[in-house]
């Protein structure tokens, strides 16, 4: 089954949310306290997704706010360099800084992130800075969960969703749950459920859907889709790590995609690369089952490399991994 989208739009995908800096440890297999060297990359889930999408050949744009500093200029320059439209990337004029994420790679199984997110520019995007004429030029609007964690970014995202719905732009909600961004799980559940119920496509891990539903124990996919299909969503993708991912349609179809074998260097970046390749396949008319394969293959490639944004693969790399058909089979 394919997913129907408008064909008369200039952009395939526009994302709204955070763009920040990732500083990834160059020295592997050691704790942060002993790490001396880091490499700088563009980070932030929605930024990574549009970068990955653009590298795959989609026409992608970005709505967000960056700091008026060296890091902000690096973000804008890098995004432009890979083909992302930055005409709606606003430069902060109130002294807010770029968010920083330092990553620690103790082992493939033990990676952590140290975040600096106090008064960051991306959370100060205001509703007045969201342009309806820009949104209506796209097939999809991608919303990231972290952008809902604080005002005025929260209201800017809610406005963008309203404008998308008014202009027949499909809304994709990438849950992107970061607990350090929120006051309480209950607050997260309120805003996640509000946005999920208005979205057309919802993508996240099983654990992120549990947060959306305010569960304290692992939830059930069938219960999740019963709840969400009472509202706007037409397609729900639930990721289960090495067990693969599952896609469900409101029409009743269900699909499973398996994870691909790879040599894991680190665990972060998988979700963003998954989303960019999954959406690429959907937009290209390849069908939902094939889109699951593209998402899984892209994630497997990125976790084997040092960065997230810079490691986003090409179509040829993804298709080569799919062709090898070396999947992880877990019942």
UniProtKB/Swiss-Prot annotation:
Its EC number is 2.7.1.92. It holds the Pfam family PfkB. Pathway: Polyol metabolism; myo-inositol degradation into acetyl-CoA; acetyl-CoA from myo-inositol: step 5/7. GO terms for molecular function: 5-dehydro-2-deoxygluconokinase activity; ATP binding. InterPro entries: Carboh/pur_kinase_PfkB_CS (IPR002173), DKG_kinase_firmi (IPR022841), Myo_inos_IolC (IPR030830), Myo_inos_IolC-like_sf (IPR023314), PfkB_Carbo_kinase (IPR050306), PfkB_dom (IPR011611), Ribokinase-like (IPR029056). It catalyses: 5-dehydro-2-deoxy-D-gluconate + ATP = 6-phospho-5-dehydro-2-deoxy-D-gluconate + ADP + H(+). The keyword Transcription regulation does not apply. It comes from the Bacteria. GO terms for biological process: inositol catabolic process. It is an enzyme of class 2 (transferase). Signal peptide: none annotated. Keywords: ATP-binding, Kinase, Nucleotide-binding, Transferase. Catalyzes the phosphorylation of 5-dehydro-2-deoxy-D-gluconate (2-deoxy-5-keto-D-gluconate or DKG) to 6-phospho-5-dehydro-2-deoxy-D-gluconate (DKGP). Belongs to the carbohydrate kinase PfkB family. HAMAP family: IolC (MF_01668). This is 5-dehydro-2-deoxygluconokinase. It comes from Halalkalibacterium halodurans (strain ATCC BAA-125 / DSM 18197 / FERM 7344 / JCM 9153 / C-125) (Bacillus halodurans).
């Amino acid at each position: 089954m394919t997913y129907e989208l408008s064909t008369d739009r200039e952009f395939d995908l526009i994302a709204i949310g955070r763009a920040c800096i990732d500083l990834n440890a160059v020295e592997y297999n050691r704790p942060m306290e002993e790490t001396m060297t880091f490499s700088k990359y563009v980070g932030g889930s929605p930024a990574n997704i549009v970068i990955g999408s653009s590298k795959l050949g989609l026409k992608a744009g970005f709505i967000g706010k960056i700091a008026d500093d060296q890091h902000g200029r690096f973000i804008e320059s890098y995004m432009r360099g890979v083909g992302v439209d930055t005409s709606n990337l606003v430069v902060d004029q109130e002294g807010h800084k770029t968010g920083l994420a330092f990553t620690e790679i103790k082992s493939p199984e033990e990676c952590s992130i140290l975040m600096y997110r106090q008064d960051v520019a991306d959370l100060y995007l205001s509703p007045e800075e969201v342009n309806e004429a820009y949104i209506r030029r796209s097939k999809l609007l991608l919303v990231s969960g972290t952008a809902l964690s604080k005002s005025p970014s929260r209201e800017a995202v809610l406005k963008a969703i309203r404008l998308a719905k008014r202009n027949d732009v499909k809304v994709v909600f990438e849950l992107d749950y970061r607990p350090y961004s929120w006051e309480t799980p209950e607050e997260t559940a309120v805003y996640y459920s509000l946005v999920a119920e208005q979205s057309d496509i919802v993508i996240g891990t099983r654990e992120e859907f549990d947060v959306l539903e305010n569960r304290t124990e692992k939830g059930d996919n069938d219960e999740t889709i019963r709840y969400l299909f009472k509202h706007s969503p037409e397609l729900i993708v639930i990721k289960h790590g090495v067990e693969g991912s599952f896609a469900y349609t409101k029409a009743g179809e269900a699909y499973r995609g398996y994870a691909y074998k790879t040599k894991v260097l680190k665990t972060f970046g998988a979700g963003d690369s998954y989303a960019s390749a999954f959406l690429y396949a959907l937009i290209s008319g390849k069908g939902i089952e094939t889109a699951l394969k593209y998402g899984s293959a892209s994630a497997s490639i990125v976790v084997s490399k040092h960065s997230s944004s810079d490691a986003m693969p090409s179509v040829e790399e993804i298709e080569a991994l799919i062709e090898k058909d070396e999947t992880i089979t877990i019942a």
